[in-house]
Amino acid sequence: RAYEQARLSISYSNLNVKIIASHGGLDTGPDGASAQCIEDLACFRTLPNFVVLSPCDSNEMFQAVKTISKHKGPVYMRTGRSSVVNITNSNKKFIIGKGMVLNKGIKVCVISTGMQTSVAFNALKYLKKQNINPTLIHMPSIKPIDKNLLIKHAKTHKIIISFEDHNIMGGLGSAISEILSENKPIKIIRMGIEDEIGRSGEAYQLLKRYKIDEKALIKKIINFYK
């Protein structure tokens, strides 16, 4: 409903407005499809001048707010509903346009954003016990995205898996594909909501239903190490 205002009143005039949107993605849970915004990152990525962010935990969100308060220009930042364990350092400065390597591995590189990074991090713990060691990158900055980090890891891995609580069209997976198709083509698997409308249910139930939970990621990764 407010998208046209963001487009004409903020983007067009390049106003110094910050939008912090809570309850993003399927994490909204029982409120159902009418309240689940699973295409917001795609919408705001297309608006000129907008920075688009999706931090993974409270530590990073706190640092991101400090950073965007000093940034001149429009920003859209997505936050979740559920509580998650902090992965990032509370003192680590947030830099727009930079990703974060959480684990250095081989063959498979998982790139996640927002609260899905916690899901991916938990999956990584299980995989390491099975002697499977993929790389995990957290990408809180969707626009601008860390182009150099993407190209660097595309050169050293056989496959990239994007992992997001968002429609696979227009979100993190699309942003990654756009960069690498032009600079370092590599096989990319986009794990997200596959062009469907959301449903009502607890967040963990919905992640399972749309195959973007911990078990789904583990299964996908194991297949590439066989």
Predicted regions: what they are:
Residues 1-104, 108-109, 134:
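Conserved thiamine diphosphate
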Residues 28-29, 80-226:
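Thiamine diphosphate
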